[in-house]
């Protein structure tokens, strides 16, 4: 389509209400609108010719098209911009360009996985405003602080209840269990034995202090800090030995990084580069699993150890690579982490959950979980015992998690100050005392040569 071009020296009349500084983009009052260059520009201005961020076409020689056009009106071309050397044949050479879809630039790899090299400058939002919340109701109400329910104690201190789901008065699993220890009932009198003094603090007059149903919530407002810390090695932890948001973040990042290393070893770099975009969605799945199962830290770290060994051995197997790459990437990481948590929980405490329970939590069919577990056990020769090598792996994963929590400290209640180079006192000492944390290999445990593959070659930072 071509437009005849005729130069005219007709003076253009600007409307009196034109915005100051934008008079050149105001509508034109012209009688000869069919042959004037202003009518051509006004015609072209009604349809978007180019998208945001693309090079704008030069439809008319000597005419500059502005970047942004007024929504309420078109634009005109002043008489000074009419070039006398314009040739009508030049207009037919310019095709109407179709608007191209905007290609969003890929985010840098360190956008989703920030480097936790220093203490955050500002405190994060309270737990009630955290962004990693499950959409559906879970076993423990996530709307409470630290993903737990507060314990309801009556005025007589003899009715302790902590419902698993809001507005549910039915007796729960924990309310039907026997007390952990036989604590003698006292009537607000001073205790006489040293054993009772160590069990019940003097300022806590509750007869069932060691009962599971009282210690069911991690945000109990009573003086639970005075009790002796209980170390959980498996099963459902009544009092978690980690912060929920930190463990969710750590499991999400480490699972994606371990699987990215597996894909890079299998020469699937394009799939590995797409993993950072799945971290945000994967956090919701991990939150759903941890809040429903209440697994202790030992089960989570052992699952990562199983997952690392499994992927390292399977990266050299063609059948495993072909089988897992048929599914979507999100399905792969969810299935692998779920299977690793199942095996870790069954190794530490085989009396807690069945595969049917895991199916209700994760959404996978029970037959599919059975198939995942059978294939995993066959690759491990049906031996879940860590052994000497597994003990060393446990030490490395514990040190890695301590580094992660100390450098990514959160604020719950009181503000706490952490040093990015100081490990937690409860964690085992790091065996790599002479090593320093590199920027590209911060989350992985540092191991001697020959134990784990060198992580900095596959780390995605």
Swiss-Prot record:
Nucleus is among the record's keywords: yes
Domain of life: Eukaryota
Chain positions covered by the region annotation Disordered: 75-98
Any one GO molecular-function label of the UniProt entry: cyclin-dependent protein serine/threonine kinase regulator activity
Database matches in Gene3D superfamilies: Cyclin-like
Subcellular location as annotated: Nucleus
Keywords per UniProt: Meiosis, Nucleus
Statement: the UniProt record of this protein carries the keyword Plastid: no
Pfam families the UniProt entry points to: Cyclin
InterPro entries: Cyclin_PHO80-like
Compositionally biased spans, kind Low complexity: 75-92
GO-annotated cellular components: cyclin-dependent protein kinase holoenzyme complex; nucleus
One BP term from GO: signaling
PANTHER family for the chain: PHO85 CYCLIN CLG1, PTHR15615
Summary of the function given for this chain in its UniProt record: Has a role in meiosis.
Protein name: Meiotically up-regulated gene 80 protein
Species this protein is from: Schizosaccharomyces pombe (strain 972 / ATCC 24843)
Taxonomic placement: Eukaryota, Fungi, Dikarya, Ascomycota, Taphrinomycotina
């Amino acid at each position: 389509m071509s437009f005849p071009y005729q130069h005219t020296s007709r003076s253009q009349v600007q409307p009196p209400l034109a915005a100051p500084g934008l008079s050149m983009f105001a509508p034109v009052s012209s009688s000869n609108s069919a042959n004037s260059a202003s009518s051509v520009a006004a015609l072209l201005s009604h349809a978007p010719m180019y998208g945001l961020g693309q090079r704008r076409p030069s439809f008319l020689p000597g005419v500059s098209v502005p970047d942004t056009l007024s929504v309420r009106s078109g634009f005109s071309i002043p008489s000074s911009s009419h070039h006398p050397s314009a040739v009508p044949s030049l207009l037919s050479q310019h095709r109407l360009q179709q608007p191209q879809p905007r290609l969003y630039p890929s985010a840098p790899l360190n956008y989703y996985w920030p480097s936790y090299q220093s203490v955050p400058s500002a405190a994060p939002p309270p737990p009630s405003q955290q962004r990693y919340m499950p959409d559906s109701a879970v076993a423990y109400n996530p709307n409470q602080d630290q993903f737990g329910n507060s314990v309801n104690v009556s005025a007589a201190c003899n009715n302790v209840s902590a419902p698993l789901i809001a507005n549910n008065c039915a007796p729960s699993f924990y309310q039907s269990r026997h007390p952990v220890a036989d604590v003698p009932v006292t009537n607000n009198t001073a205790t006489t034995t040293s054993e009772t003094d160590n069990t019940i603090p003097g300022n806590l007059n509750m007869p069932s202090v060691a009962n599971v149903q009282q210690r069911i919530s991690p945000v109990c407002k009573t003086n639970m800090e005075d009790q002796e810390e209980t170390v959980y090695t498996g099963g459902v932890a009544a009092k978690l030995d980690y912060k929920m948001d930190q463990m969710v973040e750590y499991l999400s990042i480490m699972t994606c990084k371990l699987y990215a290393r597996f894909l890079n070893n299998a020469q699937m770099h394009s799939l590995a580069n797409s993993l950072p975009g799945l971290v945000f969605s994967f956090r919701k799945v991990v939150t759903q699993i941890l809040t429903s199962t209440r697994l202790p830290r030992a089960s989570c770290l052992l699952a990562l150890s199983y997952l690392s060994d499994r992927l390292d051995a399977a990266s050299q197997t063609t059948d495993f690579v072909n089988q897992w790459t048929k599914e979507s990437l999100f399905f792969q990481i969810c299935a692998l982490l779920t299977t690793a948590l199942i095996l870790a929980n069954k190794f530490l405490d085989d009396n807690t959950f069945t595969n049917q329970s895991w199916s209700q939590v994760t959404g996978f069919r029970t037959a599919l979980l059975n198939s995942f577990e059978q294939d995993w056990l066959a690759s491990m020769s049906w031996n879940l015992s860590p052994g000497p090598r597994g003990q060393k792996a446990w030490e490395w994963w514990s040190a890695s998690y301590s580094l992660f929590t100390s450098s990514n400290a959160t604020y719950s209640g009181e503000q706490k100050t952490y040093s990015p180079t100081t490990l937690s006192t409860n964690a085992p000492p790091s065996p790599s005392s002479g090593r320093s944390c590199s920027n590209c290999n911060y989350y992985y445990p540092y191991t001697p040569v020959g134990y784990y593959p060198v992580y900095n070659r596959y780390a995605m930072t």
